[in-house]
Amino acid sequence: MRKSDRSFYNWLMTNRNSMAANEVQQFANNAFLDSSFPKQSSDFDELSQYLEENTTYLMSMTTFDEAWSLYNAER
């Protein structure tokens, strides 16, 4: 799979860390446990809306914005 074909969720899972040293790693850990997370999506608006309306595990949407920037840098 080329990096550009990778969904956001697939990329995010590369950041899982049981010792979660930062907020993106904690986000990845929590998204892994979220069975409703839109796993195939690479659409910023769809993901943002899902996170704003359906989750309580993000302390701030800034964490998603940071993760999205890192994701795009690798695409």
Swiss-Prot record:
This is UPF0346 protein LEUM_0763. InterPro entries: UPF0346, YozE_SAM-like, YozE_SAM-like_sf. It comes from the Bacteria. Gene3D superfamilies: YozE SAM-like. Belongs to the UPF0346 family. The lineage of its organism: Bacteria, Bacillati, Bacillota, Bacilli, Lactobacillales.
